[in-house]
């Protein structure tokens, strides 16, 4: 007997019971994006490897350890996308979307990183990302954060996420801070773990992200990034904070928040939760004004964020059990008796024409009334439409409310109107 082939570790199947809640959550997210005037862009999941090395940074964990990179049959180095911003910028440059234009874009889909799989962290995971190009003021940074806050309200999780903000300044200010931080770390090298010692010279700001308690204690005495900000970055950050306060959005300034990718400048932010154990970041982003030029385009201000959908689904299920998937079926059409199936299928097609958007399932495979009503219940139907031999003969159908148990005989020409009233 052949051995079963299973999914790759960390790359999960999502079954019908799970995809229903995903679809409802994604629908909520997309509705909010539409209300802000953002447009969808669809991007390839495979890109040329140099794109990510140039955008993310060659000495980041993502590039050094986590990317799925391979050579194709032409010998070209390709990579499964580990994040969406680089590909979105590449597409914007390639198709002339960015020069002297303002763009508000969003995308959704799978990303890939070779990490140790655990709850909320997978090797194939799904992100929804937003990217805005051509706007440089703090007002658009604030709008993105306000958009995410509207998501949390719509999903019923506002009380379980908190906003952390920081400014990492201009490239020049960050370089000055990097020198001061390295000088401090060199004085305390014996207190650093091996990972931090390596990062100290390759990407010292990432030491601020260390989860090692001893390193975190040491960093209490380290130079503060805020002390090295240029005046323009200070004004930008102050403007952002004022806008958020006016909008009633609470935040905490976290001077150790730097983000893990090299392309960020000025604003960085994260929405975090205590409800998912160690996987606390739900949504994160910031400003990356130099990335378009770095990837071959003209200098273009840009800001964006990405959100992990697996973590969002886990969070919604953990803290808002009232947020349930929509039922698979609204109406179940029951047919019993000789020669009723063709009449039932014809009625079902007519009802689909007259009730667009309503989910109607026709019984197949026979079965008595009891079995068919059990199937209707299994699929979550609110209403059953019943056709027996007598109903077919006299041109009627029985409409049964499966919640109250009330049923009414209705002329087939009036079934759609009756259902419209019943379903609200």
Swiss-Prot record:
GO terms for biological process: histidyl-tRNA aminoacylation. It comes from the Bacteria. Its EC number is 6.1.1.21. One of its GO terms (molecular function) is histidine-tRNA ligase activity. One of its GO terms (cellular component) is cytosol. It catalyses: tRNA(His) + L-histidine + ATP = L-histidyl-tRNA(His) + AMP + diphosphate + H(+). It is found in: Cytoplasm. Disulfide bonds: none annotated. Keywords: Aminoacyl-tRNA synthetase, ATP-binding, Cytoplasm, Ligase, Nucleotide-binding, Protein biosynthesis. InterPro entries: aa-tRNA-synth_II, aa-tRNA-synth_II/BPL/LPL, Anticodon-bd, Anticodon-bd_dom_sf, His-tRNA-ligase, HisRS-like_core, HisRS/HisZ, HisRS_anticodon. NCBIfam families: hisS (TIGR00442). Homodimer. Belongs to the class-II aminoacyl-tRNA synthetase family. This is Histidine--tRNA ligase. It comes from Escherichia coli (strain K12). The lineage of its organism: Bacteria, Pseudomonadati, Pseudomonadota, Gammaproteobacteria, Enterobacterales. The gene is hisS.
